[in-house]
């Protein structure tokens, strides 16, 4: 039995990540193991046996038993596989302290395992998998004014706020003479220092995405001239500056509201970006629902039948859905040429999709009746 027989697709992996994020432990008893393709299984098993011997010295009985069970389960499963091929292998083993259930998940992810990693911790280490299920293209988001800034990311249909920054930069004084010039210099220095602080934070947040080639562009906006000053001066790394899309965008608000406004105003710059597509589709669904023109469809069975005859153009699914049939519909949709958009609470209409349509709604190519 090879690792390929345990392969998960992206939709299945996304559902598993969601489940594993719920697992927490009061002690370091949850085992995470990443094995890249080609790694000899005997080497991995020998390492685990050494860890098993060390774990026998843990003083607390329940912690000791939980760690030994996790390592033992991992060894048992690896001994059933002759080699690690395909994209490699990932194992998560441990006891759920809330339910007292013990489980061991072993699978081959949709992309290659990037490194060998072993750890027992209070939670499963999922960070190496999360990039596999997210859109590869990421857009940086910056809103800046004299004494406020918001830094965020646009990942697929999700807006993620990284930090909201507040400074103190007073307005210009009208005292006259040398006192005015001195105060103006102090204010200018405070303004420069604030923009410098914003730039340093932007570099810290964005450079990892730039270095791994995932940042496709950066939107820069704000209500006044600060965005122009921020762009003209070297407040950010030149590699980030080269990704700033033109023109800069006039935005009236900070925070999530401001980021949404900036994204929608940048529609022409973000052609075919998933967030824009989702917002447009949701507006179309509302329009067709209001017109009652027969171009909106909901209900699992109705959507399934319409999909099988090629009548559906796109479907929207709420990410919190735990219905296995909905997950299967989403997996099958691509085979029928249907666009699938998974939305979460960061999209304002997500709750509407969840409550009004039980988590799934579609747009038809043509009327069925």
Swiss-Prot record:
UniProt keyword terms in alphabetical order: Cytoplasm, Protein biosynthesis
Keyword S-adenosyl-L-methionine: no
Compartments in which it is found: Cytoplasm
Domain of life, source organism: Archaea
The UniProt record lists the keyword Protein biosynthesis: yes
Gene Ontology molecular function terms on file: sequence-specific mRNA binding; translation release factor activity, codon specific
GO cellular component: cytosol; translation release factor complex
Name of a matching Pfam family: eRF1_2
Subunit structure, interactors included: Heterodimer of two subunits, one of which binds GTP.
Listed NCBIfam families: aRF1_eRF1
Described purpose of this protein according to its UniProt entry: Directs the termination of nascent peptide synthesis (translation) in response to the termination codons UAA, UAG and UGA.
Database matches in HAMAP family: Rel_fact_arch_1 (MF_00424)
Family affiliation: Belongs to the eukaryotic release factor 1 family.
Protein name: Peptide chain release factor subunit 1
Gene name in the database record: prf1
């Amino acid at each position: 039995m090879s690792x390929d027989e345990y392969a998960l697709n992206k939709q299945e992996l996304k559902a598993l990540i969601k489940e594993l994020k719920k697992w927490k432990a009061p002690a370091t008893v949850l085992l995470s193991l990443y094995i890249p393709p080609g790694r000899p299984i005997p080497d991995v098993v020998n390492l685990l046996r050494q860890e098993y011997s060390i774990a026998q010295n843990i003083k607390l009985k329940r912690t000791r038993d939980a760690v030994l069970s996790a390592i033992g389960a991992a060894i048992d499963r690896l001994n059933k596989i002759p080699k690690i091929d395909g994209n490699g292998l990932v194992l998560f083993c441990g006891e759920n302290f809330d339910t007292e259930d013990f489980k061991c998940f072993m699978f081959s992810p949709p992309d290659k395992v990037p490194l060998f990693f072993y750890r027992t911790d209070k939670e499963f280490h999922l960070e190496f998998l999360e990039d596999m299920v997210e859109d590869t293209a990421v857009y940086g988001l910056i809103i800046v004014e004299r004494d406020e800034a918001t830094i965020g990311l646009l990942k697929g249909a999700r807006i993620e706020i990284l930090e909201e920054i507040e400074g103190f930069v007073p307005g210009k004084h009208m005292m006259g003479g040398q006192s005015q010039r001195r105060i103006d210099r102090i204010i200018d220095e405070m303004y420069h220092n604030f923009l410098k602080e914003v730039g340093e934070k932007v570099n810290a947040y964005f450079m990892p995405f730039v270095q791994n080639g995932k940042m496709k562009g950066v939107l820069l906006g704000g209500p006044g001239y600060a965005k122009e000053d921020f762009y003209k001066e070297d407040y950010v790394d030149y590699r980030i500056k080269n990704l700033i899309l033109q023109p800069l965008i006039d935005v009236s608000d900070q925070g999530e509201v401001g980021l949404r406004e900036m994204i929608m105003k940048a529609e022409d710059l973000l052609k075919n970006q998933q967030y824009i597509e989702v917002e447009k589709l949701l507006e179309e669904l509302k329009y067709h629902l209001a017109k009652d023109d027969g171009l909106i469809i909901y209900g699992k069975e109705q959507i399934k039948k319409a999909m099988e005859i090629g009548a559906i153009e796109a479907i929207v699914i709420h990410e919190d859905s735990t219905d296995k049939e909905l997950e299967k519909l989403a997996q099958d949709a691509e085979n029928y040429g249907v666009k699938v958009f998974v939305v979460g609470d960061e999209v304002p209409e997500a709750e509407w999709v969840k409550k009004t349509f039980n988590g799934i709604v579609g747009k038809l190519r043509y009327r069925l009746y």
